[in-house]
Amino acid sequence: STPIKSSAASDVYKRQILGVIGDTSALDMNMLKVNECVDKVMRVQEPFKRANRSFHPEDSVIDVSGVKIGGRKLAVIAGPCSVENEKQIVGVAKSVKLAGATLLRGGAFKPRTSPYSFQGLKEEGLDLLKIARKETGLPIVTEIMSARMLERFVEDVDLIQVGARNMQNFELLKELGRTNVPVLLKRGLSATIEEWLMAAEYI
């Protein structure tokens, strides 16, 4: 809700913006306008509703285990592409924290074009990220590959990353939307901005 100060008086009122999700083509806007509690009725033209300034004009601030993302302060996520061993990830975590990073990222599961390439340390990589978090206090960010991993990620990861390859893995996005863990959604390799925002609607 947004506070509004009346120009005719010193009273401060609250304005509540309500959004209707789904097919609104049959709604009669005039029926809504006649309600004395309604100031204005307008249609959101874009297909994305939740990820839309018309529904929440205020800036979003996401709390990731005490670190705020959004608002006036810049949050920096830094770390290695792949978690390789404890010495590497703890050392990098300490270095990026010293350089001003506020979150630690590292790949435990690595999607590769070739089945013969390094696929990441997987569950062991998650354990090493947790050690680095304990050593530095930095919340951890890592990529999830499928909904089968969700329970472990919800338990251990502070910010779940959805990679470009999974931006349109809609079943995974739906499952993530049912959790209370923040999600970092990367834009797909050839996705438009609208497709990216529509993927965010699932979350």
Language model features with spans:
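Single conserved hydrophobic/aromatic residue that forms the stacking wall/gate
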Residues: T2-A9, Y13
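N-terminal amphipathic alpha-helix/helix-capping segment at the start of soluble metabolic enzymes
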Residues: E46-I77
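Active-site mouth loops of central-metabolism enzymes
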Residues: L74-I89, P115-Q119, V141-E143, A164
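Glycine-enriched alpha-helix->loop->beta-strand junction motifs that scaffold or abut catalytic
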Residues: G100, R152-Q161, G177-V183
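Glycine-rich, proline-tolerant flexible connector loops at the mouths of alpha/beta enzymes
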Residues: R105-E123
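Conserved anion-binding
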Residues: A108-R112, N166-I203
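Alpha-helix-loop-beta-strand connector modules within alpha/beta enzyme cores
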Residues: Q119-V141, L176-P182
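Catalytic beta/alpha-barrel core
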Residues: L121, L138-S146, D158-N169, P182-I193
